[in-house]
Amino acid sequence: MIRKLILPALLLIAGSAQAGDEAGHAHASDADSHLATLGDIRLVHAWTRATDRGEALVFMEIEHNGHKAATLTGGASGIADGVNLVAFRSRDGNAGYVTLPDLTIAPGTEMVLQPEGVALRLTGLDEPLVEDQSFDMEVAFDLGHAQVIVQIEAPNATRHSHAGHAH
């Protein structure tokens, strides 16, 4: 019985190790769906809120450990018509998100995409986002693209349910 379980486990580990960076695209590993990498850039805890509306905001931590600036330009997802970089702004009593063309992240810094801050906005959602499910999303940088797994949290969530532990 144990022998029957070991072979599939080894095949899963080998497949995950081969999934590395191909043609400028990085993929989240099966063993750690909360982390994706693109060279010296780490994307941690991608999440959004459950919604039945046509758009949603995606949040995450972006750690840039490289020596050259990286520019976040947007993204793509099979569940949405578009993915735009946005920032929260409150002016003259009006609050909301405005589109940003891109965002440069300095080497050795961390950028936190969070509610009422900077986020990636999914527009034209094909279907509702259901709590405790997840979906794939590509995050685009000038240096390449990283594939993240976005966890869908409660409609009123203010952070990822696993935020605060190390990866």
Where are these regions (language model features)?
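Sec-dependent signal peptide recognition
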Residues: 2-8
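Compact, glycine-rich, soluble single-domain proteins
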Residues: 20-167
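N-terminal signal peptide c-region/cleavage motif recognized by signal peptidases
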Residues: 14-16
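Domain-length cofactor-binding catalytic modules of enzymes
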Residues: 10-12
